[in-house]
Amino acid sequence: MRKTLTSIRFLSDGIRVKDKWNSLISDLVVEPTNSTGPLSGTTYIVKDNIATSHGYTTAASKILSNYESPFNATIIDLLSSNGSKLIGKSNLDEFGMGSANYNSYFNKVTNPYDNTKVPGGSSGGSAASVAGKMCSFSIGTDTGGSVRLPASYCNVFGFKPTYGRISRWGVIPYAQTLDTVGIIGENVNIIKRVYDVLNKYDDKDPTCLPEEVRQKIPTTKKETLTIGVPHEFVLKELSADVRESWEYALSKTCKLGHLVKPISIKTIKKALPSYYTLATAEAASNLSRYDGIRYGYNTNELVNSPIELIATNRSDGFGSEVQRRILLGNYTLSSDSGDHYLRATQIREELCAEFSSIFNNSHVLLQDEQSSDKVDLIMAPTSTSTAPTWDEFVSANEKNFLNSYVNDVLTVPASLAGIPAISVPVNGIGIQLMGQFGDDDLVLQLADQI
């Protein structure tokens, strides 16, 4: 086990310190720069694809296993200046690619809620650290459900804010038009407190919403809400216990005085293939920077040319799932398949427009189309089933790796549309609330009620 003044490394042989779930990659303590802020007295763990100037930033990959960032991500400085203490960096699927926290160079994460089952991914370590009561809250990233799915499996709250609300500067990109910093906590109160601290414009992030846009975002202020239930989410693959928890949450919502109505968002059916076309294409581009020459893992083998060294470094440094997605992305971007990418962007635009038209509030960046099915929020399950056991997951993945991709079918639509969504634990099963672009506070408001 290698030690530094600031961190303790957990090597891939399974050595752990104070962490029986392997939820951490490095264990460190960074005191806040302000001890009297709104988050004073809290501790947090951050996903290890977010840069910190203390310790390592690995993205759970061999190719970055020795990388030390010279700077903090914007969100790290915000949390520190508002009173929260950083106590560790969490395990994840390598570069955020996975739905079980199985694809990590530092070994898999187990689920504190049920250690026979997968914790979900890619922010499995972040969810496990909260479920295991190791910290007050944790920070993850959500590209296609990577905060909400593990929150559902680990029986905690997982919030993906509106795309652009929270700065991505210092986040190692997987798919930059989808990556969103998310918050995991045991209750909505701590998530809201953290969100209020991080919901700031950052001029270092070109995708961060400017102040003039933030001020124009309409807010919903009403006691009786209308909740939409898209029939496209009523899948035959939904397990009986997921259906039961969904029905229970809808029933409780009605008892609170809110209205529930069926709606239709037809483009949802095309969301999953569109997502994997776009995400892998962006990943192939983003990960092309890792060659092991300037920084990161280097095999130090004697080879005939620099190109051969780069190929060796990347082949040895990336895990199998990351290599698969790079290949898929490069194929999508090739001249023979460019039409697939263009069609995926069109589907995304259609989905954004259709989501926007369904909400009572207007979309600050789009001209809404008219719809007769106006609602304030949407409710749906986070996953089609409860967390599978490790044996079930490994067996299904060995038969067909696409099985793990299907886990994102209920979370991907909100990611493509860039809208806020939260997974709420209802009888041990995650139920998802989604709102209009920018209407994050309303999503958190109803999540706190149910």
Curated annotation (Swiss-Prot):
Quaternary structure and partners: Subunit of the heterotrimeric GatFAB amidotransferase (AdT) complex, composed of A, B and F subunits.
Main location: mitochondrion
Official protein name in the record: Glutamyl-tRNA(Gln) amidotransferase subunit A, mitochondrial
Domain of life according to the entry: Eukaryota
Function: Allows the formation of correctly charged Gln-tRNA(Gln) through the transamidation of misacylated Glu-tRNA(Gln) in the mitochondria. The reaction takes place in the presence of glutamine and ATP through an activated gamma-phospho-Glu-tRNA(Gln).
Places the protein is found: Mitochondrion
Family label: Belongs to the amidase family. GatA subfamily.
Catalytic activity: L-glutamyl-tRNA(Gln) + L-glutamine + ATP + H2O = L-glutaminyl-tRNA(Gln) + L-glutamate + ADP + phosphate + H(+)
GO molecular function: ATP binding; glutaminyl-tRNA synthase (glutamine-hydrolyzing) activity
The protein's Enzyme Commission number: 6.3.5.7
Species annotation: Candida albicans (strain SC5314 / ATCC MYA-2876) (Yeast)
InterPro entries, alphabetized: Amidase, Amidase_CS, Amidase_dom, AS_sf, GatA
Alphabetically ordered keywords of this record: ATP-binding, Ligase, Mitochondrion, Nucleotide-binding, Protein biosynthesis
Active-site residues per Swiss-Prot or TrEMBL entry: K47, S122, S146
An example Gene Ontology CC term for this record: mitochondrion
One of the protein's GO biological processes: mitochondrial translation
Keyword Disulfide bond: no
Pfam families according to UniProt: Amidase
Top EC class, one word: ligase
